[in-house]
């Protein structure tokens, strides 16, 4: 089963790489430094460490070696340390994504990610997910409690499908494509490839191509053009790239998945005519460029992951779960045969 899923994953990565092409336009909106003297003395949300360079995170790069504030936790701490220090809200309860999904629920959703058959075993830790989410304060913190749960379920479902070793408890089995036949380097003046580096699919959302690595790296404060391997060696960085893809709008006319699942996007008449409606299904349209929508299976596997995770979190599914019949935002079907 793992071998078959690996073959399917290679096909899916090609589709995903095409789907995120428009992210080059999002690079211009990359954020400035987040904390410390570079940001007027601001502190990081959710008690993340502020690095010497003014970025928020939980690894030793942030919490040691010139850390400016809230330097008490590093990635060496366990989940209990994260819960006790990083995630404590002013009232004493949990803050951020940890208030939506607990470590126990995370384990129930992804029980086989550390299986001996999974190349990513030991990589995708709950504490890394929580630390990365802290750099995106709106994630799992927009809307009412049910909306927040559905966003976490949707994000974990889409990333589980992208890294799956089988349905529907085998999410996060892979952290990068093995045996890539391309370095995924294309000419780009702003995000030129570093010599000898490969930008194949890595991380929970399987980010690919130099322009996406460059834009994501600038947004999260990491040199991913020079060190793309970080996405497969640092779990916090890996989750941050996935969250950047989730939170970033592709173009003025195409929303981010975050905006869709939190009810911040309203379809235009053109969207309605194209069959695009609010709901989990539209996130599949966005993330695959419509490959699984018009002529595909509507993202049935992705829906199954999503339903399972909503059940774990105890929340309803919401409307429009699949994307069958939706046109992609660019107005054309790229290759329905590439969908899986």
Curated annotation (Swiss-Prot):
SUPFAM superfamilies: Lysozyme-like, Plant lectins/antimicrobial peptides. It catalyses: Random endo-hydrolysis of N-acetyl-beta-D-glucosaminide (1->4)-beta-linkages in chitin and chitodextrins. CDD domains: chitinase_GH19 (cd00325), ChtBD1_GH19_hevein (cd06921). Expressed in pistils, stamens and lodicules. It is an enzyme of class 3 (hydrolase). One of its GO terms (biological process) is chitin catabolic process. Disulfide bonds join 35-50, 44-56, 49-63, 67-71, 118-173, 185-193, 293-323. It comes from the Eukaryota. Residues 33-73 form the Chitin-binding type-1 domain. Keywords: Carbohydrate metabolism, Chitin degradation, Chitin-binding, Disulfide bond, Glycosidase, Hydrolase, Plant defense, Polysaccharide degradation, Signal. InterPro entries: Chitin-bd_1, Chitin-binding_1_CS, Endochitinase-like_sf, Glyco_hydro_19, Glyco_hydro_19_cat, Lysozyme-like_dom_sf. This is Chitinase 7. The gene is Cht7.
